[in-house]
């Protein structure tokens, strides 16, 4: 029996890159998966890839920062698969630039996707997980959520806040068998980063590296808790 047999997972930002890699890894372990994102075509590609591998998946076009879209996402999961066991808050947008150069609109959009989105998704699944006395939430943050890189302010602030959100949710729900973990990757080669000038791909992480860690987190013994965000990096500086 596969380790996630009969488990149902939602992966936000599941149409490309890291999200697709995590979704495929969950399916390989037996989970049924709902992927969501803002673009139909990449989501359909993820579902097609999963189905060709013999898995089950649904796609939901949704803006993770929109409350009604998030409610529709969770309801689609319940209607399709009957429950929610795992939530992976992966959807995010980048936003380089110093704090003083950001427009209010840029700032608000970054916080909306990177922080409000995980809050809304988590709030939507927690009543389900609390009622069933089990559930796992994995937040995909960033090394920028642990460091303070100049020129990365709005994004970094959103990820620092996401780390804190995860710790609060863990402490508020652990007595009901709900685990919350936060993963802080270094530079990952994805659609968003692959054309970055000066980036040496051989010294970067790849989606499978993060997916492997997520699988370990959601398949370890139930009584094991990770107390702090997990930093995962390569051994070398990827910037040339």
Can you say where each PLM-predicted feature lies in the sequence?
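C-terminal helical subdomain
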Residues: 175, 182, 199-238
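Conserved glycine-rich cofactor-binding loop
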Residues: 15-17
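Active-site helix of classical SDR
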Residues: 122, 158
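Conserved glycine-rich Rossmann-like NAD(P)H-binding loop of the short-chain dehydrogenase/reductase
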Residues: 31-45
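Substrate-binding pocket helix/loop in short-chain dehydrogenase/reductase
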Residues: 98-99, 106-108
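Residue(s) in the substrate-gating loop at a strand-loop-helix junction
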Residues: 142
């Amino acid at each position: 029996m596969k380790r996630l047999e009969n488990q149902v997972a939602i992966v936000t930002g599941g149409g490309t890159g890291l999200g697709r890699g995590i979704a495929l890894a969950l399916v390989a372990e037996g989970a049924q998966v709902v992927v969501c994102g803002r673009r139909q075509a990449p989501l359909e590609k993820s579902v097609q890839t999963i189905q060709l591998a013999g898995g089950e998946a649904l796609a939901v076009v949704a803006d993770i920062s929109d409350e009604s879209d998030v409610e529709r996402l969770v309801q689609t999961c319940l209607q399709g698969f009957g429950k929610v066991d795992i939530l992976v808050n992966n959807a995010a947008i980048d936003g380089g630039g110093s704090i003083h150069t950001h427009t209010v609109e840029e700032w608000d959009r970054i916080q909306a996707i990177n922080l409000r989105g995980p809050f809304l998704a988590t709030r939507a699944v927690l009543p389900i997980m609390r009622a069933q006395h089990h559930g796992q939430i994995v937040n995909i943050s960033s090394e920028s959520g642990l460091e303070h890189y100049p020129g990365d302010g709005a994004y970094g602030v959103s990820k620092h806040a996401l780390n804190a959100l995860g710790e609060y949710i863990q402490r508020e729900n652990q007595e009901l068998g709900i685990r919350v973990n936060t993963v802080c990757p270094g530079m990952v080669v994805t659609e968003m980063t692959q054309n970055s000038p000066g980036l040496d791909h051989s010294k970067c992480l790849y989606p499978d590296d993060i997916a492997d860690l997520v699988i370990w987190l959601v398949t370890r013994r139930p009584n094991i808790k990770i107390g702090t965000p997990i930093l995962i990096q390569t051994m070398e500086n990827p910037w040339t």
